Design a protein with these regions (language model features):
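Intrinsically disordered, low-complexity proline/glycine-rich segments
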Residues: 1-101
Length: 101
């Protein structure tokens, strides 16, 4: 699967904001197409969660499963299809494939 990086798209699974991106911090020592690699535990950009009209800002951590064979700064690298709270990472770097894809 394509490796995720800071700025990769995330479908949130929330009614208030359907989409967000990975905010990071990412792995500043591992750049994918010039952008820090995303890892398990990195956060999304703040976005609205809840059911309209009751919405509140929050962030979500990447919860995986990640790629256990590619460790970046002590954490598994994240990839398209990984879970993010109620959502999923939907975009990544097509030039960097991880976990046998």
């Amino acid at each position: 699967m394509p490796a995720a990086r800071v700025g990769s798209a995330v479908v949130t699974g929330h009614a208030c904001d359907a989409a967000t991106t990975i905010a990071g911090p990412g792995a500043t020592t591992v750049l994918i197409e010039g952008v820090p690699a995303a890892r398990l535990g990195d956060l999304t950009t703040p976005h609205l969660a809840g059911i309209p009209p009751i919405c509140s800002m929050h962030t979500m951590p990447i919860i995986g499963p990640g790629c256990p064979t590619v460790i970046v700064q002590g954490q598994p690298i994240s990839k398209v299809g990984d879970n993010v709270d109620a959502g999923t990472i939907t975009s990544g770097a097509t030039t960097v494939l991880v976990c046998g894809s």
